[in-house]
Amino acid sequence: LRTSSAASDVYKRQEDMLDNTWHDFAEKNLIKIVEINETTSVLELFHGPTAAFKDFGLQLAAAFFNKTLETENKTAIVFGATSGDTGSAAIDACKHFKSIKSFILIPEGNMSEIQRKQMTTVDKSNVFPILADGTFDDCQDIVKEGFKQRSFLKNDQYLLAVNSINWVRIIGQICYYFYAALRSNNLSQPLNFSVPTGNFGNVFACYSASKMGLPLSKIIVAVNSNDILYRFFKENDYSKRDVTETISPSMDISVASNFERLLYDFYLDRNSKVCSDIYSNFPKTAININEDVWQKSDELFLSYSVDDNATYSTMKYFKNEFNYIIDPHTAVAAEAVLKLNH
């Protein structure tokens, strides 16, 4: 009985925390599903305070951070890199908690002006946006090095990640795939999801949902001209190339941080040693896995790479054909659906 009571108390505290987690959303249900035609719908994830889907994962992460810090009477430094939407969503999520100081590295260059202002105009003493030379990958390398060093931390401080390497981010994103399926057909038949991606976190959330029982037919991994994921699913070629600037900058990434999770779970049967060995010489050497193992991709994944010209064309097509405006990232996913006939 004591165990049951304790568990009930934990669940109650979790429910209370979750009830107060997602704030400042313009949509009552947080998410809106818009039917484009009989076979295609758009899952609108832009109704949060920064108009980024990452509001879902990062507001949940910030709530967990704050609860833990309150319990342990500690403070934390949030250290992250951004190609646009991660930084603004992280800053907005963490700015409410005095125990958290946010240091976000911003690459100088290809970023929308509104996202830059979302990060650099927050009037809070615990927010520190840092403009850095180089690309998002360069910023992310600095963050990874910071997590190795940790010498700058005080004794009562934690160092926390807000990029999608943080598992709580993925948890927050798994939820809306179940929501979409429940609202679409009450889980009665498998769905296809086309997901625009760079770092693979949102795709991995969709994959994780399938592992939890969500009926899925295919996950379409939709990328822009930075096509490392497309090359892997198409040709078993996971090799790093220079970043190409596009009109979908949140996906301008040369290496997908969350891909290692898929490799470990889907292809390598959770063999951590084999996974570590494969990554030991990357990115100097491309990752090419055993051909028989790689063939498993066809069970669940499709991929397509969309350049800027096709992105513009798809945005125009959706406006003219459906009177529906989509942003460049959504257009990448939409074009993948059109070309793959899914």
Functional labels for PLM-detected ranges:
Residues 1-7, 11:
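Single conserved hydrophobic/aromatic residue that forms the stacking wall/gate
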Residues 9, 15-46:
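Anion-binding (especially nucleotide phosphate/pyrophosphate-binding) glycine-rich loop
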Residues 41-96:
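Well-ordered mid-protein domain cores that form the structural environment of catalytic cofactors
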Residues 59-70, 93-103, 119-123, 210-216, ...:
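A glycine- and small-aliphatic-rich helix-loop capping segment at beta-alpha/alpha-beta transitions
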Residues 72-90, 102-104, 189-199, 219:
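A short, small-residue-rich loop immediately preceding and capping a beta-strand
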Residues 103-109, 130-131, 217-224:
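Short internal beta-strands
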Residues 115-165, 225-328, 332, 336-337:
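Active-site/ligand-binding loops adjacent to catalytic centers
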Residues 141-145, 150-210, 214:
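Domain-scale recognition of functional cores that engage charged ligands
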